[in-house]
């Protein structure tokens, strides 16, 4: 799983334990405390985001679903490969999907497909799903190209969903949260799941500066959708700045170590900025490692990828070394 290898912060564990005593009460349906905390943290980063610009969801997936039910897009454009949750959401409203294929010859770099992507973003398109960084490639988009896409989509009347669920793992990444007031067609989605290692709690948020659009999305979210425990854990996690910085440094070191080792094995490695790595090998590595009770992600079912593409998560150093040892044994025994 692509969650933080450092595990859940101790402060969040404490908040969860404390919140259990309040589970005999209904959660705050407005998530006021959590929104206030997020807005305060955004202010520290100089993002012009207020509490009213924020919607909370039972994970990012619930927010993607609420977006498509609010907008009812007939056609979406999605760079491929990308997270399958966008496809799942579009299928719920019987929407058409057009894929802009990222090329391995270009390092799956989204900046290289900019012209192809813009050409697909015509008046017939209702919504564009972007991930920054991309999952499964781990690639970040350049700031200038994000701006260009946002400008073009605004001119064409196209909504943009910017999925930033892994952005906190990227030390040098700039969030599109800076631009939610400038672009009324922009929705930024982030999650607590990955960076704070709390996938079992289900907590994500959406930021949108367009009041009308935001209210329409809110009407497509269920009542009481964020539990007492999730709200308290989120409010505590949002303040854990030192933990995020420590995570970024740790992931950067371990990712470089893994990428170098995979390259030495002779695999084609997609250089990543996130906490996971995409690579290609002709070995049936998924099956070989499964026999050793190690599970990696077979990416052959991603749109735009074929048999032989795999993704691994950056984990604790001892786990990373164990994985590499097992891969080495697979190569020797092949």
Regions found by a protein language model. Name each.
Residues 1-59, 66, 334:
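N-terminal small-domain helix-loop-helix segment of the aminotransferase-like
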Residues 9-13, 30, 185-270:
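PLP-dependent aminotransferase class I/II
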Residues 48-54, 157, 164, 184-185:
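Short acidic capping loops at alpha-helix termini that bridge into adjacent secondary structure
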Residues 69-130:
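PLP-dependent aminotransferase-like
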Residues 93, 155-156, 183, 265:
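Helix C-cap/helix->beta junction micro-motif
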Residues 105-168:
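Active-site phosphate-binding strand-loop segment of PLP-dependent enzymes
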Residues 251-252, 262-293:
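Conserved PLP-binding catalytic core of the aspartate aminotransferase-like
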Residues 291, 301-334:
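PLP-dependent enzyme catalytic core of the Aspartate aminotransferase-like
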């Amino acid at each position: 799983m692509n969650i933080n290898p450092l595990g859940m912060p101790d402060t969040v564990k404490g908040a969860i334990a404390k919140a259990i005593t309040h589970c005999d009460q209904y959660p705050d349906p407005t998530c006021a405390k959590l929104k206030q905390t997020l807005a305060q943290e955004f202010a520290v980063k100089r993002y012009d985001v207020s509490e009213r610009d924020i919607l909370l969801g039972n994970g990012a997936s619930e927010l993607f679903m609420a977006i498509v039910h609010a907008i009812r897009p007939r056609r979406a454009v999605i760079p491929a490969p990308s997270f399958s949750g966008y496809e799942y959401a579009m299928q719920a409203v019987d929407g058409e999907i057009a894929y802009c294929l990222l090329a391995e010859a270009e390092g799956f770099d989204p900046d290289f497909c900019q012209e192809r992507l813009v050409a697909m973003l015509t008046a017939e398109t209702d919504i564009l799903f972007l991930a920054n960084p991309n999952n499964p490639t781990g690639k970040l988009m350049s700031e200038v190209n994000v701006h260009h896409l946002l400008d073009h989509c605004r001119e064409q009347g196209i909504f943009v969903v910017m999925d930033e669920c892994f952005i906190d793992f990227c030390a040098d990444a700039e969030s599109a949260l800076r631009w939610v007031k400038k672009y009324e067609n922009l929705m930024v989605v982030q999650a607590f799941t990955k960076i704070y290692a709390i996938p079992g709690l289900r907590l994500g948020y959406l930021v949108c500066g367009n009041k009308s659009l935001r209210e329409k999305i809110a009407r497509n979210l269920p009542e009481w959708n964020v539990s007492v425990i999730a709200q308290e854990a989120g409010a505590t996690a949002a303040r854990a700045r030192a933990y995020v910085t420590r995570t970024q440094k740790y992931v950067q070191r371990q990712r470089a170590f893994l990428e170098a080792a995979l390259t030495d094995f002779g695999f084609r490695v997609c250089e990543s900025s996130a906490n996971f790595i995409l690579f290609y090998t002709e070995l049936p590595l998924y099956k070989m490692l499964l026999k050793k009770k190690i599970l990696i992600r077979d990416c052959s079912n991603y749109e735009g990828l074929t048999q032989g593409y795999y993704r691994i998560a950056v984990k604790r150093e001892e786990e990373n070394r164990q994985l590499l040892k097992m891969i080495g044994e697979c190569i020797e025994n092949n």
